[in-house]
Amino acid sequence: ERAAAGNPWIWRPAFFGAFASVDEALLKRGFHVVYYDLTHLYGSPRARKSGTDFYWNMVQMYGLSPRVTLEGFSRGGLFAYNWAADHPDKVACIYVDAPVCDVFSWPGRSSGNAGLWKGMLDEWGLTEARMNTFPGNPIDRLKPLADARIPVICVCGDSDRVVPFSENSAVVRQRYTAMGAPFELILKPGVDHHPHSLENPTPVVDFIVRHQAGYEAGQCYTLRGNYQNSYRKFEKERVGTVAFLGGSITEMKGWRDMICEDLKQRFPYTKFTFVAAGI
């Protein structure tokens, strides 16, 4: 209905309209939702060149923000990460959802996806013999993103049998955070490759909105501090105690339970103690 200041946009290179809760919520917040189908190009140089031409068309012809939010679902993660590694100065943040980060995991040489594996080789102009030096795995192209401190939010199921978390996003998370770069993870317990996204997209939407240019200047209040100490404790020490103060938040169902579940999803390796300290 009305574009937000700065004309922010989110760009999907694959699977437009699938599990679109984040896109729909951002549309209501004044974002442009943009699709350019590069699904079957596996983040190849050809895909990235086409994507760059498309990017300039969006910026110059339609006046969209010079910093785009990239959205990569499944194999769309190959394009999102690779294009961002080529152009970190053009990226506001990245939202990936069960993304492919290692082609040896998916489509994989021996995973039953022979047709997709061959299609990927053909697209990249590679042979089996040359795949040991494959240059397009996101797990190996993180340094340009980390140097630019591009914020990444990742949503995954911990029981994904198609694009296993342990072989893909877990590796990215470990390497990216080791470089000191910002990476938020929402890990869905017991969830396979589908369904993507979240029933309540608010955590992802809020992440994307607050990483747009000019966001802080547009706030009508000033925070007296932040949660960096808690974040470091949850991430590094992997223990945390959270106390809920007040009768309603302690006794009633609702916000307390939602916050507990949200923290456990965002910090799946952290052991939490929750205290209901009603006064």
State the predicted function of each range.
Residues 18-34:
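Short amphipathic alpha-helix adjacent to the substrate-entry channel of hydrolases
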Residues 42-63, 82:
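Alpha/beta-hydrolase active-site loop
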Residues 62-74:
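Alpha/beta-hydrolase fold nucleophile elbow
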Residues 72-82:
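Glycine-rich nucleophile elbow surrounding the catalytic serine of serine-hydrolase chemistry
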Residues 82-130:
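Hydrolase active-site cap/lid region
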Residues 113-170, 174-177:
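The feature captures the conserved acid-bearing segment of alpha/beta-hydrolase catalytic domains
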Residues 162, 166-216:
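C-terminal catalytic histidine-bearing segment of alpha/beta-hydrolase fold enzymes
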Residues 214-245, 249-272:
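N-terminal secretory targeting modules
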